[in-house]
């Protein structure tokens, strides 16, 4: 009886191991649809401390996609740090359109006709891999194909009609409520804020390990 019992135990153990293996094999892995949902990876962050008139309204932190659009990101980071001797600090958001976007980055003239990149006055469109998926995406303003400089805009709604025309390179990670404050500021007939919207301070925040964000 003892030998039979041992044999039965071995059979039961083997059956349990097989069942466990089958269960493991049946567990669903990541589907192709899940993989497609993964967004671009944030490799570095930049912060803006914004002021409207005399009021400090808060900090906006951007996540930038250095693996997807490295040249565009390097330009934005260098202009935020001022490491080339020029950049965004004390420049204005010169154009604000509610339910569309806020635009800044013209640190040479302040009216949307100026600005320059770290590569020269203009540089080519890097790629259009990313789209304007919704509020908070950061994209290069331009005057047509291959005319990127320093001007950029932050979407406040989905702007699909800009896809393939403007290079998307970042997303607001924190401070979207600050962007909304800027979006709600009063403007004149040419979309210029009645009170100056200033980047009072800006700089770079290192990212230890790149992380993906959703395309939304």
Curated annotation (Swiss-Prot):
Enzyme category, top tier: isomerase
Main localization, broad class: virion
Annotated compartments: Virion; Endoplasmic reticulum lumen; Melanosome
Pfam families documented for this protein: Pro_isomerase (PF00160)
Post-translational modification N6-acetyllysine, affected residues: 165, 209
Activity regulation remarks: Inhibited by cyclosporin A (CsA).
One GO-annotated biological process of the protein: positive regulation of multicellular organism growth
Position of sequence motif Prevents secretion from ER: 213-216
Residues the record lists as S-nitrosocysteine modifications: 202
Glycosylated sites: 148
Entry keyword annotation includes Cytoplasm: no
Enzyme Commission number, as recorded: 5.2.1.8
Highest taxon of the lineage: Eukaryota
Alphabetical list of InterPro entries matching this protein: Cyclophilin-like_dom_sf (IPR029000), Cyclophilin-type_PPIase_CS (IPR020892), Cyclophilin-type_PPIase_dom (IPR002130)
Alphabetical list of Gene3D superfamilies matching this protein: Cyclophilin-like
Coiled-coil residues: none
Annotated signal peptide: 1-33
GO cellular component: cytoplasm; cytosol; endoplasmic reticulum; endoplasmic reticulum chaperone complex; endoplasmic reticulum lumen; extracellular exosome; focal adhesion; intracellular membrane-bounded organelle
Enzymatic reactions: [protein]-peptidylproline (omega=180) = [protein]-peptidylproline (omega=0)
Residues bearing PTM N6-succinyllysine: 84, 209
Disease: Osteogenesis imperfecta 9: A form of osteogenesis imperfecta, a disorder of bone formation characterized by low bone mass, bone fragility and susceptibility to fractures after minimal trauma. Disease severity ranges from very mild forms without fractures to intrauterine fractures and perinatal lethality. Extraskeletal manifestations, which affect a variable number of patients, are dentinogenesis imperfecta, hearing loss, and blue sclerae. OI9 is a severe autosomal recessive form of the disorder.
Functional description taken from the UniProt entry: PPIase that catalyzes the cis-trans isomerization of proline imidic peptide bonds in oligopeptides and may therefore assist protein folding.
Record family assignment: Belongs to the cyclophilin-type PPIase family. PPIase B subfamily.
UniProt-recorded name of the protein: Peptidyl-prolyl cis-trans isomerase B
Provenance organism: Homo sapiens (Human)
Lineage: Eukaryota, Metazoa, Chordata, Craniata, Vertebrata
């Amino acid at each position: 009886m003892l030998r039979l019992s041992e044999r039965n135990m071995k059979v039961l153990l083997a059956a349990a191991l097989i069942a466990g293996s089958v269960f493991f094999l049946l567990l669903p892995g990541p589907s192709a649809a899940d993989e497609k949902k993964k967004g671009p990876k944030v490799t570095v962050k930049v912060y803006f401390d914004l002021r409207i008139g005399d009021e400090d309204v808060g900090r906006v932190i951007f996540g930038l996609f250095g693996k997807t659009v490295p040249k565009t990101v390097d330009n934005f980071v260098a202009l935020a740090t001022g490491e080339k001797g020029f950049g965004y600090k004390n420049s204005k958001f010169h154009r604000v359109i509610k339910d569309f976007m806020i635009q800044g980055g013209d640190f040479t003239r302040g009216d949307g006709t100026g600005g320059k990149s770290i590569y020269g006055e203009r540089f080519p469109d890097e790629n259009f891999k990313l789209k304007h998926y919704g509020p908070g995406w950061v994209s290069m303003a331009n005057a047509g194909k291959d005319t990127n400089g320093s001007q950029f805009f932050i979407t406040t709604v989905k702007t699909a009609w800009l896809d393939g025309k403007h290079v998307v390179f970042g997303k607001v990670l924190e401070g979207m409520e600050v962007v909304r404050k800027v979006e709600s500021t009063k403007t004149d007939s040419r979309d210029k804020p009645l009170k100056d919207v200033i980047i009072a301070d800006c700089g770079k925040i290192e990212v230890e390990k790149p992380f993906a964000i959703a395309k939304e």
